[in-house]
Amino acid sequence: KIKKKVFDFKNALSEKKVTNELKKNNIDLICLAGFMKILSKNFIKNFKGKILNIHPSLLPKYKGLNTHEKAIKKKDKYSGCTVHFVNSKLDSGEIINQKKVRISKLDTPDTLAKKILIQEHKLYPAAILKILSL
């Protein structure tokens, strides 16, 4: 059975409470999705090799925000999504898995985002199972 709990992560005090709760429960994996905050180096150090993130580009291309706009502006033929371990550098951790999505000439950032989101919903669970089975 997977135990879950929702945390408010708005400041350093919140981060300390989250860290204590996760350590107390001896967690195996932290999965970020749409988190949109940069974790502190201390938090990452406490859970090294246990934090996953999903990012809407084929890393190492287009780290950070506005990935769909960047891919369309550069006239890329493909974009996609990446599941990776979190380290202290933005969207730079070891890549676990990726899924390509073809960019159509008619795609807008919104339509591309929707296509990639469908693949994210398939890729992330598969990557989580892969990591937990190691």
Regions inferred by a protein language model and the residue ranges of each:
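One-carbon transfer enzymes
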Residues: 1-134
